[in-house]
């Protein structure tokens, strides 16, 4: 499968979303190359329950890119990356960002390595390990997590990776009042942003938590 086999509507949806998010349309080509690989591998390996390419654009690509403005440089660990979300879209749109995709599932990690190879993503590495077992303490300015765990669960398994004053960017649906209240000491909510994801209905929030 190649990019040309994707419908014009898929490309149009992505271009529209990038325009709304004020991101360069130059990212269309690598993002569609990633989407093509995801669709192909998903047939065999069931990497995501979403099958429709247009829905993938909205719920995977644009949803991930909605947080791009909040992290553009430094080192980032994407915990429980799954099929590379939000890590790969962020790496594509932020070439100066050094991204480590942390994924313990073997088939998903193999897919991620293939994406990195085929797209030539020199700013991306893959660690096939659980976050709590990653021996890179205090190495990252940022952590991302999308549908991984509660805020407390995320900082418990991955907090050691962050430098002092580093930030966790946790992607959530509804405003997570109870999760915020359960954060341990030395983790401070810096901001909660309501995300506007093009063509996506329903609530999306980004919780930015700073390590003190």
From Swiss-Prot:
It catalyses: guanosine(527) in 16S rRNA + S-adenosyl-L-methionine = N(7)-methylguanosine(527) in 16S rRNA + S-adenosyl-L-homocysteine. SUPFAM superfamilies: S-adenosyl-L-methionine-dependent methyltransferases. S-adenosyl-L-methionine binds at residues 80, 85, 131-132, 146. InterPro entries: rRNA_ssu_MeTfrase_G, SAM-dependent_MTases_sf. The keyword Metal-binding does not apply. Its EC number is 2.1.1.170. Keywords: Cytoplasm, Methyltransferase, rRNA processing, S-adenosyl-L-methionine, Transferase. Specifically methylates the N7 position of guanine in position 527 of 16S rRNA. HAMAP family: 16SrRNA_methyltr_G. This is Ribosomal RNA small subunit methyltransferase G.
